[in-house]
């Protein structure tokens, strides 16, 4: 196959119809396919200015060139990627009506079941396991004709905030290879940040989409709990788990969210009636701006470092100068949220992970008896962090401690929901820094578990309440990106997109501010 390496195309203009609204103007001049946002790639494919196969090859080239350094992927199947891309090109020739993201490649977190591709949840206990069916979200992106590039790295079973607890490799931050890409889903966000994929799927339990977005300068959205099917998603903590989009910008996340959202009878908590006009909300927000929007905020100075606190303050002033209405709100139980989350999450995880007995699926470590085989397999193939949380969760649920720990945490959860209800009676959305610090050095917190858990301070409240929340780039501190979190009322995901798109226009593209290491080739 002849490739137009590195897939440079000279374009005078792109006829992009709706995509060329004032908030999202078309590219002009010399472009690189792998550096284009998904909505523009989709428009080029539909207009036949480039083929879906050309787009796929550009990202395959990037993965092959950079993933030995980034370590975003655990598994790739480029033959499958190319087959789906060719199918899109053939269907375009026959004038078949396709989805808005047809032909746009996507990466998938390894927590999500993919038929005919390994799914390990980043754990040796599922090493080599190939599921017999697809998750609902995979069926939906398959129907949308989105070529899957591969499965992305993660902390084992989603337990971690740095992707250092993966049993296979440590994902590195494309902005600085010595730093974390966040977790648990650092692989998905790193792939988007490094232009290895225009879109990715992640899962968010307590911040596993939003924290990596913060660390890598990308967009990560946690949808309303129950709005995206969990069927076929490996369970960590069932009352928190949610699938969501990772992208380079708000509009792309909205388009992917529309593909994966919707009622699914296979998920007991799936919401039947949903407003799925997320891309329209993004268009309107980009065009209308932030004027008149009531933005709530909480003073982060007692849990954020001073540089992020200062940047957050400057961002609020900038938004106010554009017409936003600011309200400092009271959040009485904010400081208790992360503690309550970890108590409930570990209790649920200890129950969910009891199914991994090496008999039904996964490799076995043989012993003299069946019970011995189960015990030996779990002892050898679960990583230290997973075993730690299983033990803690079992302790939390044990007689004599259940009321003191688990039920007390559930009471805090109810209070957090009550706090949010009061906040949203006053404001349209709540703004917070996504995390207390920029991406930390790899190895810095791996043995300091409490410090690692505190990375989730700002992301766990929305998880406890089941609310939609997203992290978008807020700026750069010492050469590292930091995120701004937008939280909206339940089933008002469109507010995350409209507000995020408006703020995105004001803040601008932070990637031009990447540090010197990036520009001298020491990062991807």
From Swiss-Prot:
Record flagged with keyword Nucleotide-binding: yes
Superkingdom in the source lineage: Bacteria
E.C. designation(s): 6.3.5.7
First-tier enzyme category under EC: ligase
Active site positions: 109 (charge relay system), 184 (charge relay system), 208 (acyl-ester intermediate)
A single cellular component GO annotation: glutamyl-tRNA(Gln) amidotransferase complex
GO annotation terms (biological process): translation
Gene Ontology MF terms in the entry: ATP binding; glutaminyl-tRNA synthase (glutamine-hydrolyzing) activity
Keyword annotations of the record: ATP-binding, Ligase, Nucleotide-binding, Protein biosynthesis
Entries under InterPro entries matching the protein: Amidase (IPR000120), Amidase_CS (IPR020556), Amidase_dom (IPR023631), AS_sf (IPR036928), GatA (IPR004412)
Catalytic activity reported: L-glutamyl-tRNA(Gln) + L-glutamine + ATP + H2O = L-glutaminyl-tRNA(Gln) + L-glutamate + ADP + phosphate + H(+)
Entry similarity comment: Belongs to the amidase family. GatA subfamily.
Protein task: Allows the formation of correctly charged Gln-tRNA(Gln) through the transamidation of misacylated Glu-tRNA(Gln) in organisms which lack glutaminyl-tRNA synthetase. The reaction takes place in the presence of glutamine and ATP through an activated gamma-phospho-Glu-tRNA(Gln).
Binding partners and assembly: Heterotrimer of A, B and C subunits.
Record-given protein name: Glutamyl-tRNA(Gln) amidotransferase subunit A
Annotated source species: Tropheryma whipplei (strain TW08/27)
Gene label: gatA
């Amino acid at each position: 196959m002849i490739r137009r390496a590195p897939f440079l195309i000279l374009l005078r203009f792109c006829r992009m119809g709706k995509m060329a609204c004032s908030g999202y103007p078309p590219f002009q001049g010399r472009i690189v396919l792998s550096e284009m946002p998904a909505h523009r790639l989709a428009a080029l494919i539909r207009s036949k200015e480039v083929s879906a196969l050309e787009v796929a090859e550009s990202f395959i080239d990037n993965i092959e060139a950079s993933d030995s350094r980034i370590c975003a992927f655990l598994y790739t199947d480029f033959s499958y990627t190319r087959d789906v891309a060719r199918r899109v090109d053939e269907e375009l020739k026959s004038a078949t009506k396709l989805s808005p993201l047809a032909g746009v490649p996507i990466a998938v977190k390894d927590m999500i079941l993919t038929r005919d591709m390994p799914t390990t949840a980043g754990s040796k206990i599922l090493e080599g396991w190939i599921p017999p069916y697809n998750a609902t979200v995979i069926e939906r992106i398959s129907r949308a004709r989105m070529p899957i590039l591969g499965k992305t790295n993660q902390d084992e079973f989603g337990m971690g905030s740095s992707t250092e607890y993966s049993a296979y490799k440590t994902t590195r931050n494309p902005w600085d290879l010595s730093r974390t890409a966040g977790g648990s889903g650092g692989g998905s966000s790193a792939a988007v940040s490094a232009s290895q994929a225009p879109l990715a799927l992640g899962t968010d339990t307590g911040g596993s989409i939003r924290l990596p977005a913060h660390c890598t300068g990308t967009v990560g959205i946690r949808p309303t709990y129950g709005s995206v099917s969990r069927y076929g998603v490996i369970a960590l903590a069932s009352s928190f788990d949610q699938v969501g989009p990772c992208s380079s910008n708000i509009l792309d996340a909205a388009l992917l969210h529309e593909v994966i959202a919707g009622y699914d009878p296979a998920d007991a908590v799936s919401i039947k009636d949903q407003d799925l006009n997320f891309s329209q909300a993004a268009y309107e927000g980009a065009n209308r701006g932030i004027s008149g929007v009531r933005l709530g905020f909480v003073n982060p100075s007692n849990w954020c470092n001073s540089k992020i606190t200062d940047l957050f303050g400057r961002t609020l002033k900038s938004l106010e100068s554009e017409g936003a209405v600011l309200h400092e709100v009271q959040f009485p139980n904010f400081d208790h949220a992360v503690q309550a989350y970890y108590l409930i999450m570990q209790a649920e995880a200890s129950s969910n992970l009891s199914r991994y007995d090496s008999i039904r699926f996964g490799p076995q470590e043989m012993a003299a008896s069946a019970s011995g085989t189960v015990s030996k397999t779990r002892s050898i193939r679960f990583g230290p962090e997973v075993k730690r949380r299983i033990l803690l969760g079992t302790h939390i649920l044990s007689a004599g401690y259940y009321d003191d720990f688990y039920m007390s945490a559930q009471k805090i959860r109810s209070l957090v929901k009550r706090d949010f209800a009061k906040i949203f009676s006053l404001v349209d959305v709540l703004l917070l820094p996504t995390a207390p610090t920029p991406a930390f050095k790899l190895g810095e917190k791996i043995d300091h578990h409490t410090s690692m858990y505190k990375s989730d301070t700002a992301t766990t409240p929305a998880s406890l309440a089941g609310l939609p929340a997203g992290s978008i780039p807020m700026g750069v501190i010492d050469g590292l990106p930091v995120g701004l979190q937008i939280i909206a009322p339940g089933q008002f995901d469109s507010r995350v997109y409209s507000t995020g798109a408006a703020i995105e226009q004001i803040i601008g593209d932070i990637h031009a501010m990447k540090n010197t290491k990036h520009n001298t080739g020491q990062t991807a």
